[in-house]
Amino acid sequence: MAGASSPASLRASRSRRLGKETNRSDLFKKPAVPFAFALILADAILVALIIAYVPYTKIDWDAYMSQVSGFLGGERDYGNLKGDTGPLVYPAGFLYVYSAVQNLTGGEVYPAQILFGVLYIVNLGIVLIIYVKTDVVPWWALSLLCLSKRIHSIFVLRLFNDCFAMTLLHASMALFLYRKWHLGMLVFSGAVSVKMNVLLYAPTLLLLLLKAMNIIGVVSALAGAALVQILVGLPFLITYPVSYIANAFDLGRVFIHFWSVNFKFVPERVFVSKEFAVCLLIAHLFLLVAFANYKWCKHEGGIIGFMRSRHFFLTLPSSLSFSDVSASRIITKEHVVTAMFVGNFIGIVFARSLHYQFYSWYFYSLPYLLWRTPFPTWLRLIMFLGIELCWNVYPSTPSSSGLLLCLHLIILVGLWLAPSVDPYQLKEHPKSQIHKKA
């Protein structure tokens, strides 16, 4: 009869329903889940108090609004979009985001602070989902995610675009944990369009894509991400393409030595030199390759062994689907988060200059990274506190910068010494799941 369900479809539907119910039940059995909700509530109250009683710090808001006003006024030459801090140096996604902010707040600071307070809580919720799903950090240590004075300031007292970029980045990571690779790549590209620091995650993300999907899936995911960049920049690409690309994607900018939080101890003439930048880049790339070969691809026989095992450059999959390369195994959530957080952290350690708002680029990964090291808990907590203190020294000093670099390097050593676990888990057959539920 038309509309009648077959026994097989009924069994599959029952399996999916039971799986969802069990996942919800298991999730709420974890002490981390109610504790995470309590943290969100407590931090929401704290954010409200900060907005109400701590004076706003004027830094980039007026410049943002000036640049947005020029864009809304019809200016499409990126070289002419300027504020009191200089020309616009972010991709066009920044303009769309802050145009929406201006429309919602009228360009006023106080309602913008409320909006950023909501953004802070949304970002915290997404990060807590990542932590709960991976279950690497003990439940009580989730409180560390709410204890940064500098991060609260970046979100609700400074209103930096880093806040939107990192929220989108964390959202893309959450999607990757649910194996929504194509949708996650679209969100990731959206984050890049707000601020390019998100590209620090790109090398490890590419590796994960190669592990998670076949060649067709990888190419289509990358094409989707590229399409986002084209569509976002289209008004500028069809009018003043050279100006847009030169200003929005300038990778050669030299930051002011005075504001450097991480390399203040380096003499200014060395700090601004091309040789120093090249040395940092070489160290960055070397460590990325080393971690990829000996940590992230260890179980596949290193990078070369991994590429050979996939026949990536030699053959296309027999089925032009967007599914995983191997139907019997998937990447563990821990491997996804560890690779992305560590890859980004390597870039942070060897960034020539970290300004105060750049702390948001990796703060939310710190508890996770510390608990991936073999260090005792007391040392992890001391290092977390030490990094937070370094970021709250204003202005930074050679001593605070030197201490920050030392703490970063110790974490890197700990991550290198940590054992490499199998990045794959077996995917159970649906029938075996039905038998388990019965």
From Swiss-Prot:
The lineage of its organism: Eukaryota, Viridiplantae, Streptophyta, Embryophyta, Tracheophyta. The chain crosses the membrane at residues 32-52, 78-100, 112-132, 155-177, 196-216, 218-238, 271-291, 330-350, 374-394, 401-421. The keyword Ribosomal protein does not apply. This is Dol-P-Man:Man(5)GlcNAc(2)-PP-Dol alpha-1,3-mannosyltransferase. Its EC number is 2.4.1.258. Disruption phenotype: No obvious phenotype under normal and high temperature or salt/osmotic stress conditions. One of its GO terms (biological process) is protein glycosylation. It is found in: Endoplasmic reticulum membrane. Glycans are attached at N23, N103.
